[in-house]
Structures are given as C-alpha cells and as structure tokens.
Regions:
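Hydrophobic positions on the alpha-helical face of helix-turn-helix-like DNA-binding modules
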Residues: 28, 42-43, 53
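Helix-turn-helix DNA-binding motif, specifically the short coil turn and the N-cap/start of the second
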Residues: 49-50
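Short, Lys/Arg-enriched N-terminal segment that forms or immediately precedes the first helix
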Residues: 2-17
C-alpha cells in the first residue's frame, strides 16, 4: 500500500473508530494523519519524545486495524460506495435492481441497522 492510500485508509479508520482510542492516541494520530505533522513536530508540540510519538502511532494504527478486523465498517462502506458508483452508470433496470440487492446484502451482513 502506497503512502497516500495508507493515509486515506487511516484517516477513514480514525473518523470511524477514533472515539474508541485513548485521547492521547487519537490526538497524535489526528496530528499525524489529518494535519500531516512530522513525528518531530508532534513530539515538540506535545512535550514528549519522538519515540513516544512513534509508539503511539504504531499502537494506534494497530488498534484501528483491530477494530476494523472485528467490525468491518470501513470495508462495508467502501463496498457500498463502489456499488453506488456502479449504479450511477447503469441504464438497465434489471442490472440496477441487482446492484441494489448487492447493497442490501452488504447492509444485512454487517452491523448496520435499517429502519424500514
């Protein structure tokens, strides 16, 4: 995974699961991924060592990955987004219905709650 895709992924995971992290981990990850601050800048602004920043980033990323592995919200959102993009270009009604059924499957297999 290249750097840009990694940043995009962790920005998304942070927006989904950020509240489940410790305040310190969340703050450091936001500074690193959202504001593109260097490890040195983060260390200086938080009065901690570079090693502490690197450790917080590493542990925070691991936690975000664990949350995603367990809950799959990012994956499901990505699948739904791809299906919706596909649906926008469909001209055939039966193909559109098929895509809508795929979206329903993703929603029903996940933790999404749908009020009917």
């Amino acid at each position: 995974m290249d750097d840009l895709n990694r940043i995009i992924k962790y920005n998304s995971l942070l927006s989904i699961y950020g509240e489940l992290l410790s305040t310190r981990q969340k703050d450091i990850l936001e500074q690193y991924f959202n504001f593109n601050l260097s490890i040195s800048e983060i260390a200086e602004s938080n009065n901690i060592s570079r090693a502490a920043v690197e450790d917080a980033i590493k542990k925070g990323q691991k936690k975000l990955d664990e949350f995603e592995l367990e809950l799959n919200i990012y994956k499901e959102k990505s699948e739904i987004r791809a299906l919706l993009d596909k649906a926008q270009n469909v001209k055939d009604e039966s193909e559109l219905k098929s895509i809508l059924e795929e979206i329903k499957k993703v929603i029903n297999n996940g933790i999404w709650i749908v009020n009917a």
